[in-house]
Amino acid sequence: MNCSVNMVGRFRKLLAIAVGALGMIAIASSSFAAAANRADSDAVVAEAEKLVMQAGQSNPPNIKLINAAMDKLRAAIRIDPRNDAAYVDLGFCYTVMRDGKTAVDMYRTATELNPSGNNFIELADIYLRVGDPEDALLAANAGIVKDPSNARLYNAKGLALNDLHRLGEAQEAWEKALRLDPNLKVAQANLDALNSGQTGRGSVGKHPPQPAGAMH
């Protein structure tokens, strides 16, 4: 009797080990598939960005190329629905197409998928472009929580505060940006404009372009 009980116990342990191993294999397989999907999706995003760069070589931008880029970005999202870079680039394309509402939706989705400092900079920027400094300030502050050493987030915060006519706070934000990055020329230009009395839309500059590899 004891022998039978022991055999049953060992069988159950072996079964549990086998089930656990299968689970680990399934997780590893799923992770591998997700990584492969992201790589394929990123490759399509890169193709789309080349089209956007080509579109920007004409003035006004070549809308046919922008539409082609948007088709590729949608394809990238179908491959990997969590590719935040595709949503960021779609937001840029909708901005070029002067569809601010949809652009905001794209940038907001990017922050939901990946709440990085850079994505919140993009969201703050589009809010500023559509004349919504309140939400721009919220986006900048959310980004600062995620990336407190990002000077460009403080520059975006300063822009939002400037548009809200909270000039003292805008000055503090730009000074903070310069402490974090003394070479952030746009923050210095914004601070100089504020100190010279040039306030309001059009007297301060947007955040600077992203590093090489980004679209804007």
Segments (PLM) and residue ranges:
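N-terminal leader/linker segments that initiate helical-solenoid repeat arrays
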Residues: 29-74
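Short coil turns that delineate tetratricopeptide repeat
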Residues: 38, 81, 114-115, 148, ...
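Terminal, low-structured helical/coil segments at or just beyond the last alpha-helical repeat
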Residues: 38-40, 171-216
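Helix-start (N-cap) detector for alpha-helical repeat units in TPR-like alpha-solenoids
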Residues: 41, 84-85, 117-118, 151-152, ...
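A conserved position within tetratricopeptide repeats
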Residues: 55-56, 77, 111, 144, ...
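Structural signature of tandem alpha-helical TPR/SEL1-like repeats
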Residues: 59-75, 96-109, 130-142, 164-176, ...
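Canonical tetratricopeptide repeat
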Residues: 89, 122-123, 156, 190
